[in-house]
Curated annotation (Swiss-Prot):
Enzyme Commission number: 2.7.7.6
Designated name of the protein: DNA-directed RNA polymerase subunit alpha
Source organism: Chromohalobacter salexigens (strain ATCC BAA-138 / DSM 3043 / CIP 106854 / NCIMB 13768 / 1H11)
Family, per entry: Belongs to the RNA polymerase alpha chain family.
Region annotation Alpha C-terminal domain (alpha-CTD): where it falls in the sequence: 249-333
Subunit organization: Homodimer. The RNAP catalytic core consists of 2 alpha, 1 beta, 1 beta' and 1 omega subunit. When a sigma factor is associated with the core the holoenzyme is formed, which can initiate transcription.
Length: 333
């Protein structure tokens, strides 16, 4: 069958070879010559650097003030324990962006990721991963802060943002959020009828178990598609985009904080920080609010309880906020 010289071939043969639950090879063919490397390299970079995931970013170990300590009855020193915590694969099923988990174990025993007490919407994917070894007198108690993120985040960048509020003994970890542990691609020759100058793309992908390899490929392709969409219609109607964004925002977030019926003290503290709408409030963290003059723990707990009653919480992330309508209102005010 003869094809137009301007018509590009699209992959029609897709094979997935599962090596194990976390490791797969995905084969796509045929591509026009050169497109195997073009798309393979783009997907590989996205898979390694831009996939969202969860990681332990902070540990508070009972009796430990800094990472250069040793714990009586524990075979590993604190630095080794922190390195082991970095490899704990955590999956959060809910909408929360962070969670604090607890671990408590007495010796003699091996402390594994499965010993971490989790909430109903949190899953430890590698429960057999070893964290520490305890002898007869050993005991290990700690709290772990797990957050959702993307890419790689060094501990020193996070520490500089929270130095004033971070208590002594809260040990910071470099965080690798990407669930993709290893990815490579290769391009081989493919053939369609009489054409032998085509590409076959083979992607070899391994994850930490929190994300299926096939789903990782789909998400990376979606990210690439969304980024390229801007080039498809460079004259897109921006006003229409703004309207669509506002339609997706929960109406409760557009309501003023006065509707929360907080005490006068709490309400005045929020307004002093230019927090006028519920959408403004939920994006603030507890640490940020506690820095507000005259706003103490009691007011903070009141705010958290009122938000929880409406299915909201502090530290949430909102895209496209504030919407254009609120920007106009604030400008006119």
């Amino acid at each position: 069958m003869q094809r137009s010289v301007t018509e590009f071939l699209r992959p029609r043969d897709i094979k997935v070879e599962e090596i194990n639950a976390n490791h797969a090879k995905i084969v796509l063919e045929p591509f026009e010559r050169g497109f195997g490397h073009t798309l393979g390299n783009a997907l590989r970079r996205i898979l390694l650097s831009s996939m969202p995931g969860c990681a332990v970013v902070e540990a508070e170990i009972e009796g430990v003030l800094h990472e250069y300590s040793a714990i009586e009855g524990v075979q590993e020193d604190v630095i080794e324990i922190l390195l082991n915590l970095k490899d704990v694969a955590v999956k959060m099923h809910g909408n929360r962006d962070e969670v604090v988990l607890a671990l408590s174990k007495q010796g003699p025993s091996v402390v594994t990721a499965g010993d971490i007490a989790v909430d109903h919407d949190v899953e430890i994917v590698n429960p057999d991963h070893v964290i520490a070894h305890l002898n007869d007198s050993g005991e290990l108690k700690m709290q772990l802060k797990v957050v959702r993120g993307r890419g790689y985040e060094p501990a020193d960048t996070r520490a500089s943002e929270e130095d004033e509020s971070r208590a002594i003994g809260r040990l910071q970890l470099d965080a690798t959020f990407s669930p993709v542990r290893r990815v490579s691609y290769s391009v081989e020759a493919a053939r369609v009828e009489q054409r032998t100058d085509l590409d076959k793309l083979i992607i070899d992908l391994e994850t930490d178990g929190t994300l299926d390899p096939e789903e990782a490929i789909r998400r990376s392709a979606t990210i690439l598609q969304e980024q390229l969409a801007a080039f498809v219609d460079l004259e897109a109607d921006k006003e229409q985009e703004v309207e669509e964004e506002e339609d997706q925002i929960d109406p409760i977030l557009l309501r003023p904080v006065d509707d929360l019926e907080l005490t006068v003290r709490s309400a005045n503290c929020l307004k002093a920080e230019n927090i006028y709408y519920i959408g403004d409030l939920i994006q603030r963290t507890e640490v940020e609010l506690l820095k507000t003059p005259n706003l103490g723990k009691k007011s903070l707990n009141e705010i958290k309880d009122v938000l929880a009653a409406r299915g909201l919480s502090l530290g949430m992330r909102l895209e496209n906020w504030p919407p254009a309508s609120l920007k106009d209102d604030k400008a006119s005010a």
